[in-house]
Amino acid sequence: MKHIVKHIHFVGIGGAGMSGIAEVLVNLGYQVSGSDLARNAVTERLEALGARVSIGHDAANIEGANAVVVSTAVRSDNPEVLAARRLRVPIVPRAVMLAELMRLKQGIAIAGTHGKTTTTSLVASVLAAGGLDPTFVIGGRLTSAGANARLGTGDFIVAEADESDASFLNLYPVIEVITNIDADHMDTYGHDFARLKQAFIEFTQRLPFYGSAVVCIDDANVRQIVPLISKPVVRYGFAADAQVRAENVEARDGRMHFTVRREGREPLPVVLNLPGLHNVQNALAAIAIATDLDVADAAIQQALAEFNGVGRRFQRYGEIAAAGGGAYTLIDDYGHHPVEMAATIAAARGAFPGRRLVLAFQPHRYTRTRDCFDDFVNVLSTVDALVLTEVYAAGEAPISTANGDALSRALRAAGKVEPVFVATVDEVPDALAKLARDGDVVITMGAGSIGGVPGKLAQDTQQKG
């Protein structure tokens, strides 16, 4: 590719999905430029690596580019996209560029409605511990690497495969993981769940004859499609028919302790440095792949015991000063679908038994709030105290029956928790100051701008200290 394409421009280079690909391309020796609406830690890292980052979108930003990479979040009337069309510069979807990277190595693609980022991080960490030095592109910052991407010297590239826009069908990996299949991003599939499941079946058809689909057999929808997968299947989970199975699971001190049973292998005791049954399942996917690639059991155990997590996935910020004295434990999480939220809340209950759980939640997208409205009410009703913000629109038009006020009214009617509604995330710290008490566990949650709140709370505590 490099003899034809030397300069690659990214529209929205600071995004989680775009920045990782950009970083790998920089490290491969390409000239990389990009634009975004604001500087952040990601854009600063890319600039330090040698990328040219412009703030704001302008036609002049693509000057000299041989290709312009876009995600589905980039509008067709973006000035850089219009300029690329006018100049006949190829416009490349993000997933197509990821597919090109996968052609350079053997791809391991992690798909599923929930758990992709954590599972991708676990797979990359276990393979690294096994000496395979993988390249990885992750939708969150892997704490141990200090980045969401890395160019390794090994044969494998580990990456998330995004079903939200069906772009995972551009990928042709040699190993695939399917963590679960749930109703999300249904606009892409015409609100037809059968079409969503069919897309996952088509995803497995991208595998070569020597490839394998590593699937969570605990998920009912995944189980339904297994008979329709024509390539070799490895089942993992808690179910009796899982080929890589977790037994004797215990939660202790924020970690999960369990034994892994694998066909033809000795039982493997594991300590996972993450809470929650869902993370045990995520770890089983990594164990299944590592076992297939002959990673030593000791390396698997070490990687999982020392796993430091990934940004915004049950990320612990430590103890934060409570307004009334004492301190509360602060955790930040990217969860934005009721199933993800329930798993995180259950993990918090298991990690911190008997402690009051306070949630600050920013709903993400009006359409998701509308489509999962009752499920949101149910899961939000399981916490002890709740701060609720207005919906993060993500470019969508407001829906009056699925906004923060409507959700607050429904929660009050359900009668299990009294929500404190705030219009913006800027009001969340003050709301938590009035609500959070010594000994509480506070979780900030959502896929939108609420991700900036925990850093502010931690900074305020440091300044007071």
From Swiss-Prot:
Listed SUPFAM superfamilies: MurCD N-terminal domain (SSF51984), MurD-like peptide ligases, catalytic domain (SSF53623), MurD-like peptide ligases, peptide-binding domain (SSF53244)
Chain positions recorded as ATP binding sites: 112-118
Domain of life: Bacteria
Pathway field: Cell wall biogenesis; peptidoglycan biosynthesis
A molecular function GO annotation: ATP binding
Gene3D superfamilies on file: Mur ligase, C-terminal domain (3.90.190.20), Mur-like, catalytic domain (3.40.1190.10), NAD(P)-binding Rossmann-like Domain (3.40.50.720)
GO cellular component terms listed in the entry, alphabetical order: cytoplasm
Main location: cytoplasm
Function summary: Cell wall formation.
Protein name: UDP-N-acetylmuramate--L-alanine ligase
Organism per entry: Burkholderia pseudomallei (strain K96243)
Gene name of the record: murC
